[in-house]
C-alpha cells in the first residue's frame, strides 16, 4: 500500500539549528526554534538578543525545508509567548511556499508596553504546520455580488 502521508524534509544550515519536532503526541503543529548566526551571538554576554518593547525582529531558524509541491508551511504564534510575554508574529500568520528553498526566518513583534524580551539560542519562537494548498481560479465578473442572506453590515455586524 502506498502511503499518502506527505513528507516534510528539513536541512540544517548551521550546527546550532534545532530539529523541528512536535511537543506532544497530540500536537497539531511542530515547534521552530531560534538559531543565531555566530558563536558570539549564541554565547556572548547576553546569550541572545533583546527585542525592545513595541519593536520587531527577524529571527533565524537555521533551517531550510523541502516542502512537497502542493503544500506550504504556515507559522502561528506560540500561545504562551503571546499571553505571558506579548511576543507574537508580526504578520499574524507566516507562509512558506513550496518553491522557497532558503533559510526560514520568523518575523516576531514584542507587543508588550512593559518589558523587553530576550530570545536565546534554542528558544521556541513559533509553531508551524504543513498545509495542503487548494488552487482555484480568480476571475473578474461584470455583475455586482448579490445579497444571499439577511446579514447587513460589515465589521462587528454579527454582534458580540
Feature roles, as predicted:
Residues 1-160:
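DUTPase catalytic domain/fold
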Amino acid at each position: 500500500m502506498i502511503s499518502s502521508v506527505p513528507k516534510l524534509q528539513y536541512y540544517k544550515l548551521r550546527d546550532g539549528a534545532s530539529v523541528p519536532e512536535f511537543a506532544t503526541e497530540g500536537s497539531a503543529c511542530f515547534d521552530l526554534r531560534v538559531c543565531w548566526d555566530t558563536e558570539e551571538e549564541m554565547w556572548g554576554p547576553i546569550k541572545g538578543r533583546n527585542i525592545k518593547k513595541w519593536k520587531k525582529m527577524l529571527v533565524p531558524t537555521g533551517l531550510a525545508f523541502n516542502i512537497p509541491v502542493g503544500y506550504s508551511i504556515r507559522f502561528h504564534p506560540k500561545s504562551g509567548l503571546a499571553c505571558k510575554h506579548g511576543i507574537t508574529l508580526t504578520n499574524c500568520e507566516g507562509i512558506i511556499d513550496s518553491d522557497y528553498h532558503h533559510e526560514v526566518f520568523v518575523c516576531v513583534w514584542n507587543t508588550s508596553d512593559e518589558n523587553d524580551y530576550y530570545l536565546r539560542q534554542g528558544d521556541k519562537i513559533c509553531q508551524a504546520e504543513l498545509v495542503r494548498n487548494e488552487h482555484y481560479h480568480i476571475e473578474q465578473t461584470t455583475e455586482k455580488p448579490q445579497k444571499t442572506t439577511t446579514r447587513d453590515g460589515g465589521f462587528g455586524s454579527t454582534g458580540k
